[in-house]
Amino acid sequence: MEHQLWNAIVAVLATLDKPRNSVAFEFSDEDIVKVFYWAVIHDRPMSWAVQRRNWPIHLRKKPLPSNTTMSRRLRTESVRALLNALEQRVVVPQQPGLFWMIDGKPLSISGCSKDKQAGYGRAANCKAKGYKIHAIVGSDGTIASWRVAPMNKDERVMAERMVRTAPIQGYLVADSNYDSNKLHEACLKRDQLQLVTRRRYGPNHGTGHRKQSSGRLRAIELTENPKPAFATNLLHDRDEIERCFGNLTNWGGGLTCLPPWVRTHRRVHRWVQAKLVLTAVKRADCSTTYVA
């Protein structure tokens, strides 16, 4: 499996446009990305991937960058652009549908960690320290938009940021925690995007004296009218996002947890991005689909 994923990543990189660097480096941006993905595929730190003995025999002849070089180059704008281009090529849906789900998945770390950028907040039926991936997911498992934030960051705030730029339309289905006038307004501004969620405090509570978003009133009408079968089916199908998150973790090399060498937001974002790419490659059989 590791070699199939590696060959698929190499095939995709070969199809991407790679602008020339103004500075001559010993190792190209593509070389840096390949070494990085070799580490991520095997769930190993960068110091492991830069050692020749950890590569197949037929790939050991090529020189490898040092650990210091990897750390420095991964922060450069050109390498980050190539990582983003790889994500856009593989992860972003090519034919967006009309049904989308939104939720968050906790990425907990040790409570003793010194990571100052991690937050302490709600995880799965408990409190934990770490980060959380927020994602808008289609029914086929494709991810239209995602963000990584500290565990204590409000899911509704992250949802607003994703909705502003996500290439989606139709229905965005969420649990009651996403019931927010600001989020409904963000969906309205996108046009042809309706947030469907139950009221946060239940149908027996009023809407208060403040002005309500027309999108929120529409969601209340959909979920609380005498015949709410359509909204009920949408909310029932929202459970599919739990299986999508499960598919990120239930295979060797998936996004199971954050290893000890992945700390601070920059490294966590880069690690999660690579895991999303690998999961999409695995799902789409990229070794044959993306070859030019």
Residue ranges and their predicted role:
Residues 28-36, 241, 269-274:
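Short runs of predominantly hydrophobic/aromatic residues within well-ordered alpha helices
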